[in-house]
Every structure is written in structure tokens, then in C-alpha cells.
């Protein structure tokens, strides 16, 4: 593995930390801002090769997140040691999520995932599993200048919004679960996201979309 590979995984690791923090989990600025030298020192072998087992981490919801999303629970992030996710790899990951009572699991892999492995994901319900290819996390898409701010609403906020504007869920514009920002935030079916955009004429304005 070259130093370029280590650089790549360092970027992926930092974006994963940012993602977890943006979902409302307790991640320190020090973790998010880990330098490349620190990454090599803490996560790599003497030859500079990243040890993916060392990169795995768990996080707990922040007090603010628990207040807004009481059902949130802990999250586990795992970096797959195999290049591709097989049924065996996914089964072991599902067992780890279930046995340790994680509410959410994130599996980051290098190349691809077999359809059979993907079909195992619902087996951990009521826990949920999100999967990302390493290239998905090379950059944080939410920091792109053209991507507006997305904020996930709580159940209470959703109820208030629908009642205030006398709306039915079917009347709201939609955002697909496969949307890159929806995946980043971990949006689930039926959840609403508030999207804040800037306008040269009207300043900031908000719109809402429901995840399907």
C-alpha cells in the first residue's frame, strides 16, 4: 500500500468522523481535525499501511441530539478489511450490531458489495445499516459551495410543520433515500429535511422535502 493509499484512507476516515458528528453524535474537533501524521502514528503499521481494524469506532448521541431524537442510540462505524463485502463479512457485521445493541451501523468498503450481502441488511431491524464506498467519503459533499444546508427534523418538528401549513405528507416535495445528502444524514423513509438556501434577492429561504 502506497502513501497515496494512506492519504486516501485518512481523508475517508475524517469524512466519516464529520458525518457521524453531523448526525448528532459526540465527536470532538480533535477527532475531526486529525492530521495525516497523527493518522499514520495512530492507525498505521510501521510501514505506513493503515490498519482498518484500528480505524473502527463507536459514538454516542450528544445530549442535544437525544433531546431531539430520543430513539437515536449508539452508532458503530467499521472499515471493511476485505476489498469487497461478501455475505460472510456482512453477516459478521450484522451480528456485531445486534449483539452490541447499536442503533445504527455504518460499513465502509473499498470496491463493491455483493447483492446477497446487501440483502442481509434488513435482518438487523430495528437497527439500521448504512453502507458507503470509500470513494463516497473522499470529500464531504455537504461542504460543497453548491450544496445548501440540510437539517433533519424531529418527529415533533415534522408534526408541527404539517399542522401549521395544513399539509399531508403526500403534498411535500420528495428526496430519495439514495440522494447523496440523504445518505450522509441517514434519512429514513417518512423523515423530513429542511433545506436552507441563499438568494441574492430574498436572503435565506427554507423548503422542505420528505424522504421516500
From Swiss-Prot:
Query: How is the quaternary structure described?
Result: Component of the RNA polymerase I (Pol I), RNA polymerase II (Pol II) and RNA polymerase III (Pol III) complexes consisting of at least 14, 12 and 17 subunits, respectively.
Show the InterPro entries listed in the entry: Arch_Rpo5/euc_Rpb5, RNA_pol_Rpb5_N, RNA_pol_Rpb5_N_sf, RNA_pol_subH/Rpb5_C, RNA_pol_subH/Rpb5_CS, RPB5-like_sf
Entry's localization field: Nucleus
GO annotation, biological process: termination of RNA polymerase I transcription; termination of RNA polymerase III transcription; transcription by RNA polymerase II; transcription elongation by RNA polymerase I; transcription elongation by RNA polymerase II; transcription initiation at RNA polymerase I promoter; transcription initiation at RNA polymerase II promoter; transcription initiation at RNA polymerase III promoter
- What's this protein's family per the entry? Belongs to the archaeal Rpo5/eukaryotic RPB5 RNA polymerase subunit family.
Which terms in the Gene Ontology molecular function aspect does this entry carry? DNA binding; DNA-directed RNA polymerase activity; RNA-directed RNA polymerase activity
Q: Does the keyword Acetylation apply?
A: no
Q: Does the keyword NAD apply?
A: no
Question: Gene symbol?
Answer: RPB5
User: Tell me, what's a Pfam family for it?
Assistant: RNA_pol_Rpb5_N
SUPFAM superfamilies on file: Eukaryotic RPB5 N-terminal domain, RPB5-like RNA polymerase subunit
Record's GO cellular component terms: RNA polymerase I complex; RNA polymerase II, core complex; RNA polymerase III complex
Chain's role = DNA-dependent RNA polymerase catalyzes the transcription of DNA into RNA using the four ribonucleoside triphosphates as substrates. Common component of RNA polymerases I, II and III which synthesize ribosomal RNA precursors, mRNA precursors and many functional non-coding RNAs, and small RNAs, such as 5S rRNA and tRNAs, respectively. Pol II is the central component of the basal RNA polymerase II transcription machinery. Pols are composed of mobile elements that move relative to each other.
Q: Which domain of life is it from?
A: Eukaryota
Which keywords are on file for this protein?
A: DNA-directed RNA polymerase, Nucleus, Transcription
User: What is the name of the protein in this document?
Assistant: DNA-directed RNA polymerases I, II, and III subunit RPABC1
Amino acid at each position: 500500500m502506497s502513501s497515496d493509499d494512506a492519504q486516501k484512507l485518512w481523508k475517508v476516515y475524517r469524512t466519516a468522523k464529520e458525518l457521524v458528528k453531523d448526525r448528532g453524535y459526540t465527536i470532538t474537533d480533535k477527532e475531526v481535525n486529525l492530521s495525516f501524521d497523527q493518522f499514520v502514528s495512530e492507525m498505521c503499521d510501521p510501514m505506513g499501511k493503515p490498519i482498518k481494524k484500528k480505524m473502527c469506532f463507536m459514538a454516542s448521541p450528544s445530549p442535544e441530539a437525544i433531546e431531539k431524537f430520543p430513539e437515536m442510540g449508539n452508532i458503530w462505524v467499521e472499515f471493511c478489511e476485505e476489498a469487497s463485502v461478501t455475505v460472510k463479512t456482512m453477516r459478521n457485521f450484522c451480528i456485531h450490531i445486534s449483539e452490541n445493541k447499536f442503533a445504527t451501523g455504518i460499513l465502509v468498503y473499498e470496491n463493491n458489495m455483493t447483492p446477497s450481502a446487501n440483502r442481509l441488511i434488513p435482518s438487523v431491524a430495528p437497527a439500521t445499516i448504512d453502507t458507503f464506498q470509500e470513494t463516497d467519503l473522499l470529500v464531504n459533499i455537504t461542504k460543497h459551495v453548491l450544496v445548501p444546508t440540510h437539517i433533519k427534523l424531529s418527529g415533533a418538528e415534522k408534526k408541527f410543520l404539517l399542522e401549521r401549513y395544513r399539509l399531508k405528507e403526500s403534498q411535500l416535495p420528495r428526496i430519495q433515500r439514495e440522494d447523496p445528502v440523504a445518505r450522509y444524514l441517514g434519512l429514513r423513509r417518512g423523515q423530513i429535511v429542511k433545506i436552507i438556501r441563499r438568494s441574492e434577492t430574498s436572503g435565506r429561504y427554507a423548503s422542505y422535502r420528505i424522504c421516500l
